[in-house]
Amino acid sequence: MAEDSAGLPSNYQFWMQKLSVWTQASTLETQRDICLHLPQFQEFLRRMYETLKEMDSNAIIERFPTICQLLAKSCWSPFILAYDESPKILIWCLCCLIKKDPQNSRESKLNSWTRRLLSHIVSTSRFDIKEVGLFNQVLGYAPTDYYPGLLKNMVLSLVSELRENHLNGFSSQRRCPERVRSLSRDRVPLLTLPDFEPLVEALLTYHGHEPQEVLCPEFFDAVNEASLLKKISLPTSAILCLWLRHLPSLENTMLHLLEKLISSERNSLRRIKCFMKDSLRPEAAACHPAIFRVVDEIFRSALLETDGAPEVLAGLQVFTRCFVEALEKENKQLKFALKTYFPYASPALVMVLLQHPKDIPQGLWHQSLKHISEMLKEIVEDHGSYGGPFESWFLFVHFGGWADITAEQLLMSEAEAEPPEALLWLLAFSCSPGAGHQQRARTMVEVKTVLGCLTKLFRSPALSARDLQAAAGENLGGDPRPPACQQLVRRLLLHFLLWAPGGHTIAREVITLMAQTDAIMNEIIGFLDYTLYRWDHLCVEAHRSRKLARELLTELREQALPGQVNQ
């Protein structure tokens, strides 16, 4: 096409052919060819605009029917839209096609087609907000036509820059720390918008070369709150970065969890497990020992401050179970040695406790319990190098199922058999780690006496509540038992009611006699809830015992006063 007849550059046909090739093939050679010719093509567009702006839209279409094809192919090329001022020049060219007062359907259709292309360019290109506003004012279409695409493109552009990617063959410059900090602060009001999630993730995983944190604290706080309230969904890798870079976020998450443990989710381990997996991310703790140790230390402090509150203890055990599952799933080959998770504990004891009871033949449980007891006793009573009694107890109760298995094993042993000292010591230690040697010995005597009576009654066909009252009666001259010992005896009685054939018929009567206070009522409900949870994980096949435990749990929850126990 001649330049004098068309009013367009003489190489118009050359670029039409190039665009056809570029749009039909997406090979590496094609992309290189595009990048090679982008400067010349932009100059062609500029000269073409200088020609088109002097013409009426009808005249342009009448004389040059392929102009729409050329502009459309240019507008849908991400390489052209990403290069320098090409998007602006394309907009100028398209504006030449718009008829301000269309007189017929053909002109109206051309206007609609042109506006769609303009909206596409505005929403996919990087423009200053003032330029976007100017386009809107001149072209006369609503922001809703292009804002969603513009927002998405802006987010993708920022993500690309943060990750120092190469866009269409052009390297984006690294952002300075002040710019990254400003970016994190300015996006706080917007971070719950779904389109902003990739940017939030990119900011959290951004790693510059600065010695100090570049993201603002307000950003971390807002992300953590939004994550807790389910207003934003982030992958575990981003949550891991959040907690490693901002300790208060992890602490706030833990405080939120503990509040639920003690209030709304009390005695509901299944809901606690779901909540814990959603918010605390045990897999994040498995991925990095630092996170596990912070969570562990918060649980430790909570147990000390609440004097070993059962709900906190149960939460620790659920967290540990989830953590171990994540550890086994994510780290078939451990990235970190176990000692980095439990730096002050005996490695041998940790290895034994990490074994899930269901992975050990039931006939060997007694042997495993004896081994655990001997190792703990050596550390506690021989003053080993792994901390005091509380530290050993704290490690043991992470894997609290072993203590309940100990009680069950002792109850179901032969009536004539002498209860093993190792298992008695383990029970006494589990209920009162701070007790001295003499106090622990007394507890062992108390438990041994109660067990002797219960094992004799275990297979009795006819039982009464009075029989169990007598079996659990105070001993040693009538001195009152310490509270921890009383709680241990109650747990033995509850185990008996669930496992003894004759216990099922008197269970409700015995529990009514036991639950003299709201605290004991909550204790019994917590025991039943945890027992069912533990049996599920052990795959215990005890239909009658399970049925009784579920019925008792439902009935006691209904009896509990509103606000005392989660419904």
Swiss-Prot record:
- Coiled-coil region list: none
InterPro entries given in the database record: FANCC
**A GO CC annotation given for this chain:** Fanconi anaemia nuclear complex
Q: Does the keyword Nucleus apply?
A: yes
Q: Name one Pfam family in it.
A: Fanconi_C
Chief localisation class: nucleus
Its annotated compartments are: Nucleus; Cytoplasm
Asked if the Swiss-Prot or TrEMBL record annotates the protein with the keyword DNA damage, the reply is yes
Q: Which domain of life is it from?
A: Eukaryota
Q: Which UniProt keywords apply?
A: Cytoplasm, DNA damage, DNA repair, Nucleus
* Gene Ontology BP term (one): cellular response to oxidative stress
Protein purpose: DNA repair protein that may operate in a postreplication repair or a cell cycle checkpoint function. May be implicated in interstrand DNA cross-link repair and in the maintenance of normal chromosome stability. Upon IFNG induction, may facilitate STAT1 activation by recruiting STAT1 to IFNGR1.
Q: Subunit structure of this entry?
A: Belongs to the multisubunit FA complex composed of FANCA, FANCB, FANCC, FANCE, FANCF, FANCG, FANCL/PHF9 and FANCM. This complex may also include HSP70. Interacts with ZBTB32. Upon IFNG induction, interacts with STAT1. Interacts with CDK1. Interacts with EIF2AK2.
Protein name per Swiss-Prot or TrEMBL: Fanconi anemia group C protein homolog
| Organism, as annotated | Bos taurus
